[in-house]
Amino acid sequence: YHVNYDTQERTLKESGKLYADYVTGLVMPQVVILAGGLGTRLGELTKTIPKSLITVSGKPMLSHILEWAGGQGCRDALILTGHLGEQFEGFKHDGMNLTFVQESEQMGTGGALMNAIEYLEDEFILLWGDDYHPVNYRRLYASHKEHQQSLTMTVIQSDELANLRHENERVFEYSKSEISDSFNGYEAGTSVVDKSVLVKFGKSKKWSWEETVYPQMSGQIHAYIDETPFWDMGTPE
């Protein structure tokens, strides 16, 4: 609610307008796309082409992701490549400034970020190059700023896919492989990250971002609840 201090009236409509103005006025940060995985679940498809360059509905998966990001007001994208990374050479997207950083060997999701740390902005939206998740970036980023956490994770409240436990807008447990009766949400694949998190937990060897950072930041991750569906290129189908 917005409170008028002269009359002490509380007005939901005015509060909504203030929030909308704040969201509209945000300068959107860089998007960082993890696009260096081997894509083994796709079998023969990814032996000759990176997963995020596979054509889906007439254009590469990466183009779909960048089209959404651009429509949300993002203008800069850092794309982290690895497997067959040379195939990204010459890739362009209208309205977006693209920077590609290729790792010389498979370093895991965390290692890929560390390999590109000099190109990262102080805040960035972290995406997976094989997921299409059309969540409202402006609202997500506004929520990140409002809660003043260094990491905000988009969470879908799904019991079928659950891989985390959240409570009072905080993530307390996460597992990529284990199942727990306490889990009540699923990481949707879009996060807002402060570069300071990478500086704190980063390693010079191969390491997993999600399996390292999420458990160690238990209770410090803001859970942004949003039921926007996402599509994962996990199988050829």
Annotate each PLM feature.
Residues 3, 82, 101-103, 154, ...:
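Conserved beta-strand termini and adjacent loop/short-helix elements that scaffold enzyme active sites
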Residues 38, 49, 84, 131, ...:
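A generic "binding-loop/recognition-motif" signal
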Residues 147-157:
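A short, conserved acidic/glycine-rich loop-to-beta-strand motif
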